[in-house]
C-alpha cells in the first residue's frame, strides 16, 4: 500500500482536537502574537521527507522560540541564524563519529530531510520567547499518531531518541520491527552524560547498510 502523509494528515485534521487546536493558534496569530514557525512552515518535515522515504527519525521537542529560527524541522535553523547549543553539540559528536565531517557554519538541516531523515518535533508550534507555550494544545496527540503510523505501516526505521522526553514519546515503538537508539539529549545540560560518544550517526549508517538501504550522507549539510 502506498501511504502518503497527505492521507494521514487529512485524517487527523478532521478530528475535533485538531480543529480546536488550530482555532486557538489561528486566533493567536490574528491577535498579532508571533507564532513560530510561520504558518507555511509548520509541516515542512512532511513535505521534505515523504512517508515512503522515511528511514530515520530524529525526535525533537518543540520549535525554537526566537525570531527567524524555527522552520519546521527539529534541531534545524534557517541559514544566517546562529547555531543553537544543542545542534552545536550534535556537530561536535558528528565530527568525532563520522570521518571527514567538518561542522558547517550554519544550522540548516534540509539536506538530511531530503535523504529520508524525518526531523520531527513532538509539538509543532510555539509562541515567541515562550518555550513549551503550545505544549498540551493537541500537538502531542497529532505526533503520537504520526509515530503510530510509521510504527505500523513501515519496517526497519531507525529512531534516534535523545533525552527522557523523546524516549517517553517512543515508548510504543515496536523494537522487533524497528531500531531504537537512545542517548541523553545533546543540550549543554546533558550532552556530557552520554550524548558525546554515543556514535548514533555511524550506528545509523551501519543499520542502514545491514538493510541494504542508502546510508545518510551526514556531511551533505557542509555542502549547502
Swiss-Prot record:
Active-site positions on this chain: 62 (proton acceptor)
GO biological process terms held by the UniProt record: base-excision repair, AP site formation via deaminated base removal
Family note: Belongs to the uracil-DNA glycosylase (UDG) superfamily. UNG family.
Localization: Cytoplasm
Predominant place of localization: cytoplasm
This protein's name: Uracil-DNA glycosylase
A Pfam short name: UDG
EC number: 3.2.2.27
GO MF entry, a single one: uracil DNA N-glycosylase activity
Catalytic activity of the protein: Hydrolyzes single-stranded DNA or mismatched double-stranded DNA and polynucleotides, releasing free uracil
Amino acid at each position: 500500500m502506498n501511504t502518503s502523509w497527505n492521507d494521514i494528515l487529512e485524517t487527523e485534521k478532521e478530528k475535533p482536537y485538531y480543529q480546536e487546536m488550530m482555532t486557538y493558534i489561528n486566533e493567536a496569530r490574528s491577535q498579532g502574537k508571533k507564532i513560530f514557525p510561520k504558518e507555511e512552515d509548520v509541516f515542512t518535515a512532511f513535505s521534505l521527507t515523504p512517508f515512503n522515504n522515511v528511514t530515520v527519525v530524529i525526535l525533537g521537542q518543540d520549535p525554537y522560540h526566537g525570531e527567524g529560527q524555527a522552520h519546521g524541522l527539529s534541531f534545524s535553523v534557517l541559514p544566517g541564524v546562529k547555531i543553537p547549543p544543542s545542534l552545536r553539540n550534535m556537530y561536535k559528536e558528528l565530527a568525532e563519529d563520522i570521518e571527514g565531517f567538518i561542522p558547517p557554519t550554519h544550522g540548516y538541516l534540509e539536506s538530511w530531510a531530503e535523504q529520508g531523515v524525518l526531523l520531527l518535533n513532538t509539538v509543532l508550534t510555539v509562541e515567541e520567547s515562550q518555550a513549551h507555550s503550545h505544549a498540551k494544545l493537541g500537538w502531542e496527540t497529532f505526533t503520537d499518531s504520526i509515530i503510530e503510523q510509521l510504527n505500523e505501516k513501515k519496517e526497519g526505521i531507525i529512531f534516534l531518541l535523545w533525552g527522557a522526553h523523546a524516549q517517553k514519546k517512543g515508548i510504543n515503538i515496536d523494537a522487533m520491527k524497528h531500531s531504537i537508539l537512545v542517548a541523553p539529549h545533546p543540550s549543554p545540560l546533558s550532552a556530557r552524560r552520554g550524548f558525546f560518544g554515543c556514535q548514533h550517526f555511524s550506528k545509523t549508517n551501519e543499520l542502514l547498510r545491514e538493510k541494504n538501504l542508502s546510508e545518510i550522507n551526514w556531511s551533505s549539510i557542509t555542502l549547502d
